[in-house]
C-alpha cells in the first residue's frame, strides 16, 4: 500500500462539471483537489480568506477532500523575479498566497510562473535566488512550502531542467522551499526518473502531466514513478495536471491513474 495519495487539479474541467468530477474522484479513491485560486475566486483571490476557509470546509465535510497544492498562483500578474522592483511587489503578492494556502490547510504551492522568470541577457541568477530565499522564509512562517517547478524552454529560459530545480533547492537549503516534480518537464527534456531517486526527499508535490498539458497518455513512466515513490516512502500527493477537457476524458484519466498508482 502506497504512502502517498492521489489528487487532480481543477484546471482540467469546466466549473459546471465540479460535482460530477468530485463524485468520480471519490469513486476512484482520490482524496485531494489541487486548485488554481482564480478558478474558485476569479478576482483578487487572496482577499477571500473567509471564503477560502469555507470552501476548504465544504470539500472536507461534503467530499472528504483536502487541498494538497495550489498552482497558477500568479495568474494575471506581471513583473519579473530578476527585476528587484518587480520582485518586491511579487513577494508581497506571494505572501498573500501563502496566507490563503494556510487558510485552506494547503501545504504546497507550485512555483511555475514561466513568464515571470524569463531571464534577460545580463540578468544574474543571484537576483532570482535572493527572491526564492525571501519567499522560502515567508513560506516557512506560514507553515507551507513554495514548490519550484522546472519548465521546458518552450515556456521560459530559467530552470528548464528538473536537475536545475533540485540543485537550486539543495543549494538554498531553505525549509520553505521544495521541488514540484513535473512529469511533463521530464518527458519534454528527455530526463530519466531514476536519475533523481536520491533527490525525491526534496519533493513536496508531484504532477502527472503531458507536454503542453495535453490529456494524459498511458506511459511506462507512470508505473516507474509509482514504484520509485513507493520505494522512497514519499508521503505527499500525486496529482493529475492537464488543460481543460471533457468530462469523459477526466473520468477515464482518474480511473487510469488510480489503477497505476494505487
PLM region descriptions:
Residues 1-7, 68-80, 114-116:
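N-terminal small/glycine-rich loop or linker at the start of catalytic domains
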Residues 2-7, 15-31, 90-91, 105, ...:
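Histidine-acidic metal/acid-base catalytic patches
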Residues 12-14, 37-39, 73-76, 115-117, ...:
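Active-site-proximal loop/turn and secondary-structure-junction residues that shape catalytic pockets
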Residues 49-62, 130-139, 195-198, 224-228:
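Catalytic-core regions built around general acid/base machinery
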Residues 36-57, 113-119:
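Glycine-rich, proline-tolerant flexible connector loops at the mouths of alpha/beta enzymes
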Amino acid at each position: 500500500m502506497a504512502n502517498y495519495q492521489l489528487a487532480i487539479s481543477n484546471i482540467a474541467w469546466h466549473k459546471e462539471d465540479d460535482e460530477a468530477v468530485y463524485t468520480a474522484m471519490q469513486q476512484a479513491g482520490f482524496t485531494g483537489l489541487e486548485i488554481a485560486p482564480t478558478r474558485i475566486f476569479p478576482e483578487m483571490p487572496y482577499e477571500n480568506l473567509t471564503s477560502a476557509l469555507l470552501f476548504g470546509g465544504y470539500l472536507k465535510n461534503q467530499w472528504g477532500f483536502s487541498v494538497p497544492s495550489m498552482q497558477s498562483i500568479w495568474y494575471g500578474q506581471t513583473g519579473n523575479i530578476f527585476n528587484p522592483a518587480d520582485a518586491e511587489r511579487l513577494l508581497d503578492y506571494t505572501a498573500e498566497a501563502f496566507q490563503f494556502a494556510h487558510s485552506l490547510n494547503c501545504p504546497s504551492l507550485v512555483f511555475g510562473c514561466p513568464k515571470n522568470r524569463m531571464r534577460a541577457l545580463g540578468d544574474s541568477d543571484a537576483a532570482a535566488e535572493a527572491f526564492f530565499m525571501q519567499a522560502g522564509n515567508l513560506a516557512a512562517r506560514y507553515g507551507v512550502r513554495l514548490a519550484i517547478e522546472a519548465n521546458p524552454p518552450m515556456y521560459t529560459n530559467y530552470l528548464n531542467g528538473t536537475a536545475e530545480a533540485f540543485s537550486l533547492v539543495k543549494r538554498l537549503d531553505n525549509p520553505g522551499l521544495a521541488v514540484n516534480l513535473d512529469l511533463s518537464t521530464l518527458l519534454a527534456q528527455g530526463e530519466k526518473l531514476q536519475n533523481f531517486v536520491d533527490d525525491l526527499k526534496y519533493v513536496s508535490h508531484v504532477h502527472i502531466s503531458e507536454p503542453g498539458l495535453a490529456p494524459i497518455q498511458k506511459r511506462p513512466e507512470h508505473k516507474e514513478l509509482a514504484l520509485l515513490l513507493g520505494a522512497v516512502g514519499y508521503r505527499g500527493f500525486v496529482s493529475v495536471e492537464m488543460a481543460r477537457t471533457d468530462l469523459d476524458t477526466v473520468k477515464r484519466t482518474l480511473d487510469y491513474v488510480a489503477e497505476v498508482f494505487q
